[in-house]
Amino acid sequence: RSTYVLWGLSQECLARTLWPLGTFLKSEIRDMAVSYGFEHLAKKSESYDICFIPDNDYRAFLNHRIPGLEKQLEGGSFIYKNNTVGRHRGYPFYTIGQRKGLEIAMGHPVYVTAIDPDQNRVYLGDASDLMDRFLKVRDLNLIKYLQLPDNFTARVKIRYKDPGAMATLHQINQQAEVVFHQPVSAIAPGQSAVFYEGDDLVGGGFIAPLDSKVIKS
């Protein structure tokens, strides 16, 4: 599963990489880096993925990093079936596919299906509204191939814990069109789409937003 975050590596990087670190402690690796003249790397601060945010509270994380953000953006519209159904706390605090924490009573489950940053609008819909078969990938990086074969079939993961779904890929320069064989849920622009052939990591890229400025599934 950890290969999901490695799609951006090149063959040049992989050729110089030793796996795994095994029984070495991180402190020992830092000492090794210093001994080889990479003191600036050894002293770098820890890096954390967003999944390490305390209590998974990205709203508190954003408010801490950008003081006044919520006050600046609160009061935008929740839109459901072209009607305004409530007010939200600011579009950055919501993600495609989100159901919990919306703080709006609709009488039935609703999900974030689209986000319009320019208008500070968050669009809501039913679970079926999240389903789609198509996405585009930008900043394509390939590890296994120099160029994707024609009508290439791969297992595509669109989030870290996603088991993946089969799709047909068509490469266009540094982009790719991905057509899933069955609809998948909550395709979110900005997330990584990662391609596998069996257990082999083929490559990946970032899910591109649609031509519209509205970010949707």
Segments the model singles out, each with a brief description of its role:
Residues 1-217:
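Nucleotide-activated chemistry modules centered on ATP-dependent adenylation/adenylyltransferase
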